[in-house]
Amino acid sequence: MQQPQQQDLQIGLPYAPVQPPIPSPAAYFAYLPSPSRWTFTQGLIVGQVSMVIVALLLIRYVIFEDSATALEKERLMRLKVSQRRSKLHAKALLQDARKANSAAASAAAAAAPSPASHPLRKSHRLASDTRASMFANILDKTAYDLSSHLPESADWLNVMFAQAIAGYREDVLTGGVSSHHHTASDAIPSPNPLEPQKERTARDLMEEILNRATSSFLDPIRVTEADFGDAYPIFTNARVRPADDTGRTRIEIDVDYSDQITLAIDTKLLINFPKPRFAVLPVSLGLTIVRFSGTLAIELFSSDPNATVLPTANPNPSSSSSSSATPPRSRHQLHFSLHPDFALEASATSLLGSRAKLQDIPKIEQLLISRLRGWIMDRFVWPRYWSLTLPNLVPSPAASRSFSAAAAANRHTDAASVGSSGGHGQINVGTGVERTDASVIQPGHHESARQEMLHAASERPSLASSRPPHVRSSSSGLRANGMGSVEAWRAHAAGVYNQPSHQHATSLNQAALLRAHVGGGGATDCAPGSDVNIEVPGSYRGSVAGAGIELASSSNASSVLPTGAHHSSGLRNRPGFVQ
């Protein structure tokens, strides 16, 4: 009865109802996600490894940096600092020159002092002219033309220097010079090989040098390897270059040294807090120099021979007797310096730790090489120099008498004190810093800062047309190469012989006559404070500070110079110095 009723109801509906099938338990669990095949231990290990990899990448690319990139950044930074300093220095020099010229012009117009009222200034100018004439005469008699002479080889210097290095290298390998030395005639060669003994004594010598300065946080240093190589430096391209505006010259030589110089040490870093030797870190370091190349500048510097007080070898004498016995130091010195663009190729090894060791850390290698480069720059790169004081062969009479009396009194007691204190016949070694004013020509440059500013300010087309040719005296006409006068030498040192060949230079006597007649005026056609259109005897551009010679206009010069002393050849056109 009920089934027909349900069928009637289903027939009355628009569509038959659908009843979802009831799934079985196996089919129900089949729809659920499958459990992971990774265990808890495996997941922990993968997570720790990923954290270690991230930490290593962070340390490698964030904390440490590549040594080549660091060196390039340091070079660019130094280049930018050098350019900024050069611009500021040139700007300051230009302002000072303008102020000095304006002040000199106003003072000359107001007071018009005579040359006789300044005897010290006149004597200084004459002394400067005399020294410039001496430098010009040196190059003239040695037949060395700065503008056209090619760089020379230094093969003989390489052989001689290699012999000296070989001798000193033997002294280092044997631990120092023995007091019982033998000459070449009575030396007996040892039949046994001495290589192990040489290496041991060389290590002992280096340990003695390194352990002279001790510290509380460092154990004594032990040298494990000391190799001083077997090659020699090679010098090439020797040339003469100007040193300043007064005519001094320097010798520039390219040096290249490729070898394997190795020094390896072992020590321990101590932590003495909260108690002594609370922690100890073993440290092993090694440094190898592979190649060094650069340009060496050698300059013979002589102080003023007319100085009233010469420096002594003992700057702080303890008593009057010791000061009277100390002779004056020689005024002749050899200055050795390097160009700033030297190249240093080196490598370093490191090993830190006792049980867990860190080997060849890039930061330590970069630190060691930068400290070595900084040590060279702080002691040998221009304007700093390494000086070699030459013997004082011709002392003053007073110093010679006092020294002879003191030496005779102390002949039997301290006869060797003179040689050790830097007296007669003793060569002293020291360091110093060159003056870096506007008149000094830096190594590798052809002109000083003052000359470059004056040439840049005087590059005008009207200057060449308004400059009359000057004549040459009979004394300068005897010079075949145009280097017979002070003005010609100074213009040659400045490298500004770019005028036509019919312009001539005057001699030293004519320059003195010009100063006597003109009165040190320096009259020009320009406004006060200008650095252009300055007429100098010898037909080259310059300034009072740059050339050290009083200036006169062409109208005043024509009233003093002889008119019939023209020479057909004149001065040769001299281009700037060629590196």
From Swiss-Prot:
Residues 65-579 are cytoplasmic. Residues 311-328, 465-476 have a biased composition (Low complexity). The gene is MMM1. Residues 1-43 are lumenal. The SMP-LTD domain is a barrel-like domain that can bind various types of glycerophospholipids in its interior and mediate their transfer between two adjacent bilayers. Signal peptide: none annotated. GO terms for biological process: aminophospholipid transport; intermembrane lipid transfer; mitochondrial genome maintenance; mitochondrion-endoplasmic reticulum membrane tethering; protein insertion into mitochondrial outer membrane. It is a single-pass type I membrane protein. One of its GO terms (molecular function) is lipid binding. Keywords: Endoplasmic reticulum, Lipid transport, Lipid-binding, Membrane, Transmembrane, Transmembrane helix, Transport. This is Maintenance of mitochondrial morphology protein 1. Residues 150-391 form the SMP-LTD domain. It comes from Mycosarcoma maydis. PANTHER family: SMP-LTD DOMAIN-CONTAINING PROTEIN, TEX2 PROTEIN-RELATED. Component of the ERMES/MDM complex, which serves as a molecular tether to connect the endoplasmic reticulum (ER) and mitochondria. Components of this complex are involved in the control of mitochondrial shape and protein biogenesis, and function in nonvesicular lipid trafficking between the ER and mitochondria. The MDM12-MMM1 subcomplex functions in the major beta-barrel assembly pathway that is responsible for biogenesis of all outer membrane beta-barrel proteins, and acts in a late step after the SAM complex. One of its GO terms (cellular component) is endoplasmic reticulum membrane.
